[in-house]
Regions:
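A glycosyltransferase accessory/donor-loop signature
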Residues: 3-6, 10-81, 87, 98, ...
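Short, acidic, metal-binding catalytic loop of nucleotide-sugar glycosyltransferases
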Residues: 91-99
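Short, charged, surface-exposed secondary-structure boundary motifs
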Residues: 134-140, 199-206, 305-306, 321-324
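The conserved acidic donor/metal-binding loop of glycosyltransferases
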Residues: 171-175
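Conserved donor-nucleotide/metal-binding helix-loop-beta segment in metal-dependent transferases, i.e.
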Residues: 178-212
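Short, flexible, basic/aromatic active-site loop/helix in glycosyltransferases
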Residues: 215-229
Length: 365
């Protein structure tokens, strides 16, 4: 392709994108929202704190830049979540236009080709050793490598690896659709607080739970005292932290001791009997119980209130890149597909390779 051909190619790709993903009014509306044209005026649902002026989310650090602030994602256990990490980086760079540094952590199981692809999106790709605890709380026959290795996320606290004032961790299955840079202004550590829905098949769902964005989380909310008395906890899919090498080393030492010495005294509300199911998440809940700051749930939305959401999270179940066949059937899926197409405009070979190798599929395998 010549330089003269490139604008036409981009224009054609943009037209295909619009044709494919603007078939429904809701999708067009959400697409406009990505450009900042959607007003938060027609709230439906209970995700938004009615006492919070959404203009607060426009406040960002005066010194925001790649030297002091960073976003990070994590890819471990092979390359199954590579499309998610690629889209997180693409969305942060080209949809919400952050000027913070982008760093992706990978372990040694991630192939060099995947690392190279990430290196074209992120400012830095860092290979980190996998971290595992002395015990996870799972029955051994139910323990999957995906959850066993999630303590690897603790590397984001390592100031030697992250020499920044603040680092924002974004899960590979969390899609930023509006700017997250405001989170760097919050006291660290910060996370969305979850609470129990006894009618749900899962223990935790997002609610405000009486805490306010940017305010300290009452430690009692994070206390779990028995099998029947489960209050709430943090969601580890979006974390804003201040790296601290000494604290990081202390955490590493702690997870090498039996969980009975430091873990909570409950079993999660799962029929399977899983105890401490999201291990690193609950470890951090205990570690910083007196220190957490609340993040508004719209930054880590369960895709229930899309017009007000800043981030969409596919927590449990099928991931968007595993079932992308007809994006127009779902607004949230269409938004993820739009981010994938944005990545394609910049790096078509990366998308083509992932699709050819079955990492991005039209339907579940």
């Amino acid at each position: 392709m010549t330089d003269a051909d490139e604008p036409n190619a981009v224009d054609s790709a943009a037209k295909r994108l619009l044709t494919r993903f603007t078939e429904q009014t809701a999708i067009r509306r959400l697409a406009r929202g990505l450009a900042g044209e959607l007003l938060l005026a027609d709230h439906e649902g209970d995700i938004v704190d009615p006492n919070l002026d959404p203009r607060v989310f426009t406040r960002v650090p005066a010194d925001l830049g790649p030297d002091r602030y960073a976003y990070t994602a994590l890819l471990i256990g092979g390359e199954g979540y590579l499309p998610g990490c690629l889209v997180v980086g693409a969305a942060l760079r080209w949809h919400v236009h952050t000027c913070a540094a982008l760093v992706c952590m990978v372990d040694d199981s991630v192939p060099q080709g995947a690392r190279d692809a990430l290196g074209r999106i992120y400012d830095r790709v860092s290979v980190v050793p996998r971290l595992r605890a002395h015990d996870s709380g799972y029955p051994t026959d139910m323990l999957s490598d995906a959850y066993r290795d999630m303590y690897t996320k603790l590397h984001l606290f390592d100031a030697a690896l992250f020499p920044y004032e603040r680092v924002c961790f974004v899960d590979a299955d969390l899609l930023p659709i509006r700017c997250f840079d405001h989170l760097f202004t919050l006291p660290a550590p910060a996370a969305v607080i979850e609470s129990v829905d006894p009618t749900s098949q899962y223990a935790y769902v997002h609610h405000m739970h009486g805490v306010r964005h940017g305010k300290p989380v009452p430690p009692a909310i994070l206390e779990v005292t028995s099998d029947e008395d489960v209050t709430g906890g943090i969601n580890g899919g979006l974390l804003m932290v201040a790296p601290d090498r000494a604290r990081f080393e202390d955490m590493l030492a702690r997870i090498q001791r039996p969980m009975s010495e430091w873990g909570p005294r409950h079993r999660q509300l799962y029929d399977s009997g899983i105890r401490y199911g999201f291990a690193e998440q609950h470890f951090l809940q205990v570690e910083f119980q007196q220190e957490w700051t609340a993040i508004d749930p719209r930054f880590n939305s369960m895709r229930t209130d899309l017009p007000h959401s800043f981030g969409l999270h596919w927590t449990i179940g099928r991931k968007p890149w595993q079932n992308l066949g007809n994006p127009a059937r779902s607004v949230s899926l269409a938004l993820w597909a739009m981010a994938w197409e944005t990545l394609r405009l910049h790096h078509p070979d990366i998308c083509a390779d992932a699709e050819q190798r079955g990492l991005v599929r039209d339907k579940p395998s």
